[in-house]
Amino acid sequence: MSQDQVLDIFRNSEALLEGHFRLTSGRHSNRYVQCAQVLQHPPYTERLSRHLAALLRKGVGLPDVVIGPAMGGILVAYEVGRALGVRAIFTEREKGLMTLRRNFVVRPGETVVVCEDVVTTGGSVREVIDVATAAGGRVAAVAALVDRSNGQVDFGVPFFAALSMEVLSWPPEECPLCKEGTPAIKPGSRT
């Protein structure tokens, strides 16, 4: 799939929003990518995940397990795992810390791919990497539907994205939209 084909899916799903947004990272932005608008359409989710799976297969081979952070990474991890024919699990927050629950495990020595819907600063992905590594897993790659950093985030492993785009963001104290008096909204999964 080309970047234009991926972008068409996001446009058709009305997932590209304009306004003033407070991101999970705490930064502010004039654009927001609401992947849930894409993920509500199983054919789009399957198509994008198969694309990510093909990139992963070519780039790092077949992992033992795919793992994504709740909330946004669950469907992506599941569909990528399905396309690769491997287990798919997810982490969730417990008392503010990312953890494996529901008897999910990463076995020592397993090769892991971390999947996410959107990467901005990479904070949630790094937490999942830490969980997988602490369990004895070897993280081979990260994959996301959208890389908002346009390739600027470094996880220390190959990073594959279906769509890479540069989206401006600022610390709240430097946000021009705040200075204009425009209220910021928090559209993401962590409010």
Swiss-Prot record:
> Which cofactor does this sequence's record say it needs?
Mg(2+)
Keyword Transferase found: yes
Catalysed reaction equations from the record = orotidine 5'-phosphate + diphosphate = orotate + 5-phospho-alpha-D-ribose 1-diphosphate
Q: At which positions is 5-phospho-alpha-D-ribose 1-diphosphate bound?
A: 116-124
Metabolic or biological pathway, per its Swiss-Prot or TrEMBL entry: Pyrimidine metabolism; UMP biosynthesis via de novo pathway; UMP from orotate: step 1/2
Q: Which GO terms describe its biological process?
A: 'de novo' UMP biosynthetic process; pyrimidine nucleobase biosynthetic process
Give one Pfam hit by family name.
Pribosyltran
Keywords noted in UniProt: Glycosyltransferase, Magnesium, Pyrimidine biosynthesis, Transferase
Which superkingdom does the taxonomy of this entry point to? Bacteria
Q: What does this protein do?
A: Catalyzes the transfer of a ribosyl phosphate group from 5-phosphoribose 1-diphosphate to orotate, leading to the formation of orotidine monophosphate (OMP).
Subunit note = Homodimer.
State what protein this is by name.
Orotate phosphoribosyltransferase
The organism encoding this protein is Heliobacterium modesticaldum (strain ATCC 51547 / Ice1)
Gene (UniProt):
pyrE
